[in-house]
Curated annotation (Swiss-Prot):
Keywords from the UniProt entry: Isomerase, tRNA processing
UniProt: substrate binding residues: 110
Catalytic site: 52
Family affiliation: Belongs to the tRNA pseudouridine synthase TruA family.
GO MF assignments: RNA binding; tRNA pseudouridine(38-40) synthase activity
One Pfam family linked to the record: PseudoU_synth_1
Official protein name in the record: tRNA pseudouridine synthase A
Protein EC: 5.4.99.12
GO biological process: tRNA pseudouridine synthesis
Amino acid sequence: MPRYLAIVAYNGAPFRGWAKQPGYHTVQGQIEQNLALIYQTPINIYGSGRTDKGVHAINQTFHVDLPDKLPLKQLIAKLNQLNYPDIFVKALVPVAPRFHARFAVKTKVYEYLINTRAFNPAQYHTVWQYNHPLDLAQLEADTTLFLGRKDFWSFSTASQKDTQRTISKIIVQQDHTGTVKLTFFGNGFLRNQIRMMVASLVALNNRTLMRETVQQLFDQPQKGGCKVKAPACGLYLKTVLYE
């Protein structure tokens, strides 16, 4: 069967994360269920990585092997009708038979949104309602603590052996609504890594955490060493880039 790379957006609020789990409503589970409904046979999809409960995606990717029965435009239309309103398939692109959506990743880009003004109930599931001002200059200066290749074990709840990751760039921006956007570019991220980094940056900003403490978490890495974690609602998988 031909292999395709899919690009998909989703609202993470109603789901128990990306990865299918028995008894839970997940993004992967819903897409596979609807593909099986369309083709009348089980079909597995393989994502570029997992997102946790409540985390959103603008351009998540997965690969899938599909029977050559439906035109792609018709398939996308059927999927989007079945997945409405929380999942939207943007594209299906033919790829090589051995292409793998996870192992071929070169760079992942995540965004994190923080509301620094008054509480906004309309954004409760989409933006961290921090509701206090942030010093952008300090925020930008503190991002340097996380740049480069480091052992991020302290900033994760991951059990995996390889906890070395490279963060090539972190961009700090604020728009006219007071929403601060942190954009992270890396070769991959551990579970909860970005949420722990964001919470650490905010704690550094309000002086409840010292730079020396953050450096110690890198010098003496230990699972879950970082004790702060930003809410899932503000995190978005923005882009997955391949070789």
